[in-house]
């Protein structure tokens, strides 16, 4: 969830189990996501889908993750480590310089987009952390009730 999902999505290869669920739930706490979700989610799933999931905090199932291209492999939960190790072995046995030359430009592309988007998203995250909706979400969490958002 949130930052954890973003970190996973920034990995070179993502192996997920069938019960895996990703979500960026900042919005459910009245906060704009500012941890990189606005960078990687649109790149992997497309802008419209990313907007939906980031604006709603809706969960993305393992099957959806695979269908949308957010994960490379979907396996049974008890096979995650084995599949990840098999992927690592395959890459380790490959031509290191060619593999690096293939991924470095992609990482550079992601870094360039991050440099454009992250300052604004972090600023907006900070701004929304002080909003009445964020205060209400925190209060509701402590009181174990659903928040009632009202800031428009």
Predicted regions: what is each one?
Residues 2-4, 59, 78, 135:
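Glycine-rich phosphate-binding loop at the start of an alpha helix
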Residues 18, 47-51, 60-67, 94-100:
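Short, structured loop/turn "capping" segments at alpha-beta junctions
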Residues 1-55, 68, 83-87:
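CoA-thioester-processing core
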Residues 12-13, 52, 56-58, 64, ...:
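Well-ordered beta-strand positions
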Residues 137-152:
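Short, basic/aromatic-enriched C-terminal tail that caps enzymatic domains
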Residues 37-40, 49, 61, 101, ...:
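Hydrophobic alpha-helical segments typical of transmembrane helices
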């Amino acid at each position: 969830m949130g930052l954890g999902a973003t970190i996973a999505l920034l990995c070179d290869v993502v192996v997920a189990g069938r019960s895996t669920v990703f979500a960026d739930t900042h919005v459910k706490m009245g906060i704009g996501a500012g941890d990189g979700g606005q960078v990687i989610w649109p790149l992997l799933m497309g802008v419209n889908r990313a907007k939906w999931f980031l604006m709603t905090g809706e969960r993305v199932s393992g099957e959806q993750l695979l269908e949308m291209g957010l994960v490379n492999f979907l396996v049974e939960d008890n096979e995650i480590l084995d599949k990840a190790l098999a992927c690592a072995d395959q890459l380790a046995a490959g031509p290191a310089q060619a593999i690096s030359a293939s991924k470095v430009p992609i990482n550079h592309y992601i870094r360039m987009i991050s440099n454009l988007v992250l300052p604004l998203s972090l600023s907006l995250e900070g701004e929304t952390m002080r909003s009445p909706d964020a205060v209400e979400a925190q209060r509701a969490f402590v009181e174990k009730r659903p928040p009632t958002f009202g800031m428009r």
